[in-house]
Each structure stands twice: as structure tokens, then as C-alpha cells.
Amino acid sequence: MHDRGGRVTRKDVARVAGTSVAVVSYVVNNGPRPVSKALRERVIEAIKETGYRPNGVAKALALGTTGTIGLLVPNIKNPYLSELAHAVGNAARQRGLNILLGDSADDRQQEASLLENFVLNRVEGLLFYGVDGCPPELEKLRDTTRVLVFDSWDSPSFAHCMRLDEGAAAFKAVDHLAEHGRQRIAMITGPLDQRNSRIRMQGWAEALRARGLQEDSNLLQSAPYSRSGGYQAGEKLIESAVDFDGLFAANESQAVGFLAACSEAGVSVPKDVAVAALNGTSMGSFTIPSLTTFEQCVADNAESAVECLLQANEPQLLAAQGDLIRRSSCGCESSYV
């Protein structure tokens, strides 16, 4: 069953799984061609049965370590997640570790497939940012891998968690718009089937109630967490008969899209509509006008997350740090930071 040196090969796995060596490679490398769920599971079972380990980690496994941690994010095109990935990479390299990065592309099936890939590659730890919460596939890492989950309210009992109080952050941003005298504050939410979207919307509503302002469902537009999503939601709000003088976006990319919609429609920001957003990045300094955002301390949070992943034995709950950065879009003086 094995080659002459006694080493299990992909050919052995293919024989046990009843498939081709190419298909085994697609499963191990997570591409480049798709593999059906049933066939993928068959290959994974064959890998477990034969004891096969992917090339590149065999020597490290013999020493009991791979020197690699994984980072799985839902969409690397999201500027905040790009900054997080960069910061995690820096924190890992400072500790002599490699990073294996996975991008789910906002697809739960892709997310599950990538989790299987991390298991196969025997990462020592996994930093996980879910498409929407924690999928059941995370349980497969319970006995083998340290896990830290970002911004989840349903993290498994064995995992560490780093979480921003997104409701409080949204409250602070919306309340700041109200401080500028805005009375009708609209919101671009994320997809409403995602829990974090609902938490951010709750923060918006609580801020309005605290100021005695009206909650109006006509002031809400749901959109993907993207520039195009924010642009399309902005078009709908501007073209509607709804009167609004403030806008809170659930993330920075949506806010950037909204600014573009305002520019095309001749809506002045902040004169006509004051704007603030959640999960800002350095990009907010360079929009026109510059964007007021609640920004997480990404570098510090990444350092804390990696250190916790490597050192803490019992599951820890870490509070992500951040603050509101006031720039021009809300009516404050611009701050290029």
C-alpha cells in the first residue's frame, strides 16, 4: 500500500478513496478544481485511514510542531479584514511563526472546505472570523488545535474569543451624529440574516431612543458589506421620499459607496447628510470628505489575539479595543490619522 520507503503517498490515498491522485490533490490543496462534498469527505476519510500527511509539513510533524497558525476571514477584500490579516501576519512573524491564510469569500461552503484544509495541514492554532458566527465544522478542531474566534456570540466552549461590543460602538457613532444636531439618522445595515448586522442595528435604535429621536423603518436599507452595497443603498435612500440628515453605515466599505452615491446625486456631505460608520481603517482619511468611523486598534488586538492563542490554556474572552475617530463627514474638522 505504501511506497518502498514506507511513506504514505497521495497515490495510496487515491486507491483507498477509489478516486484519482488529482482529486486527492484538489482536496489537500483546496483547489484549483472543485470537489463534491461527498467525494471530499471520502478523500478525507481515506487520509485519516492511511495516516497521510501533506508534503511540506511531514518533517515539522515529526518534531511535533508545524510552526504555522491559520487565519480564516470571510472576505479579504474588506479593508478592515485586510488590515487584520496584515497585523496578524506581523504578530506571527515576530514569534517565528508562519501564517496560512484562507478567504471564505462570504461563502459558507467555502468556509467549511477551508476549515477541512486547515485540519489537513495541522496548523498549531487557528484565528477564525466567520461568515456568520461559528459553523459546526469548528468542532473538528476541538482536540487538536487551539482556536480563537473573532466577533462571535456563539463561539464553541473550547475556543478563545475576541469580541468588539458592536452595539456599543454603533451607539457611539450614531450618538455623535445626534450631537451634531441630526434628527433623522438613517442606517445602511448589513444582511439581516447575519447576527452582527442585527446587533449593529440595535445600537443604532438604542442611540435614537436615548436622544428621543424617531425610529423609522423607512430609514433602514439592508445591503452587502461592500462599496457597491453602500452605493446601491444610498441611491435608494436618496431617490426615496424619506427625509434624512444623517447616515450611519454598518461598515466603512458601505459608507464609501454611500459617499459616491451622494456625490453623483449632488448631496453635500456633511452639509446635507452627516455620515459615520463602523469598522473603519486608514482608508477613511483619504475619502472626500474624510470619513468619521469607529476604528478598532487592529495592531494591538492582533498582538493580543496571537499571544492568547499561543499561551492561554483555558478559554479566554478578550475585549477588542477601539474608539470613534472624528473626521469631516460628520461635521467635525478633518483629521488625517
What are these regions (language model features)?
Residues 37, 41, 50-117, 121-124:
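Amphipathic helical "hinge" segments at domain boundaries
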Residues 74-83, 101-110, 161-172, 188-233, ...:
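Hinge/beta->alpha junction and helix N-cap segments in small-molecule ligand-binding domains
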Residues 128-172, 193, 213, 253, ...:
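Flexible loop/hinge segments that line or gate small-molecule binding clefts
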Residues 1-66, 334:
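N-terminal helix-turn-helix DNA-binding module of bacterial transcription factors
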Residues 235-337:
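Flexible loop/turn connectors
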Residues 122-130, 186-189, 220, 241-254, ...:
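Periplasmic-binding protein-like
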Residues 183-184, 215-219, 268-272:
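Short acidic capping loops at alpha-helix termini that bridge into adjacent secondary structure
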Residues 21-25, 61-75, 184-191:
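Short beta-strand segments enriched in small/hydrophobic residues
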